[in-house]
A protein has these predicted regions:
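Membrane-interface extramembranous regions at the lipid-water interface
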Residues: 6-37, 43-85, 111, 127-163, ...
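Glycine/serine-rich loop-strand microenvironments at binding/catalytic pocket rims
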Residues: 35-39, 92, 115
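General secondary-structure edge motif
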Residues: 38, 106, 119-122
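Membrane-interface interhelical connector segments
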Residues: 99-112
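Hydrophobic alpha-helical transmembrane segments
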Residues: 112-128, 166
Length: 202
């Protein structure tokens, strides 16, 4: 039933008038789909589809509450992750090609590949931290406008996972964040809470 609703949103819905129900269903199902990348053959496709659904849900939420910065922060986070991945592979490949092209050293080992690997991991790690910071900002604001405080926890777990990804345990935190993300979306009420009060001016 939920999947049928998702298809009806994507095909028949008036995109100029998104609702919180759209955000709830698209975001929740999208987050769950992102978790099943391990399924043979089609898992990665389902995961990408889920990622796109979450993006659509957050764009809808930004539009509903007139909070474009939420979606902007998310896009910055995604861009940081992509840049980190690209830098990682470019530095690794460049180091290996340099090692292959350089003449052998008889008296001292060539440490260029090792240094390249270290730099690649550090660049990837830095990009992940930047991405985690912006995701945390986006989900923190989502918690404020929707009244679902679990979004704030989701953003924090994403940030922790991004920081710890360099030692692999961060991947577990990212999986937990995805689960919390799904629960957060499904916890959205169709009636929006009153907007948070602006900070006092002294």
């Amino acid at each position: 039933m939920r999947l049928k609703y998702v298809f009806s949103i994507l095909i028949y819905r008036d995109y100029s008038m998104p609702t919180l129900e759209d955000v709830k269903v698209l975001g929740g199902i999208g987050a769950l789909c992102s978790l099943i990348s391990f399924v043979p053959y089609v898992g990665w496709l389902i995961s990408i589809a889920g990622f796109i659904l979450v993006l659509i849900a957050i764009k809808y939420l930004s539009d509903i509450f007139h909070e474009p910065q939420i979606f902007t922060n998310l896009i910055i986070a995604i861009a940081a992750y992509i840049v980190g991945i690209i830098l990682f592979f470019v530095i690794i490949v460049g180091s290996l090609l340099s090692f292959i092209a350089s003449p052998p050293h008889e008296n001292s080992p060539n440490l260029a590949p090792l240094l390249g690997i270290i730099v690649a991991f550090l660049a990837f790690w830095a990009a992940c931290i930047v991405g985690g910071v912006y995701i945390n900002r986006a989900y923190g604001r989502m918690a404020e406008v929707t009244g679902v405080e679990l979004f704030r926890t989701t953003g924090l777990v994403y940030l922790i996972g991004s920081i710890l990804v360099i030692i692999l345990i961060g991947l577990l935190f990212l999986v937990i964040a995805k689960i919390l993300e799904a629960v957060s979306f499904f916890s959205i009420k169709e009636e929006a809470p009153p907007p948070p009060l602006p900070p006092p001016v002294y």
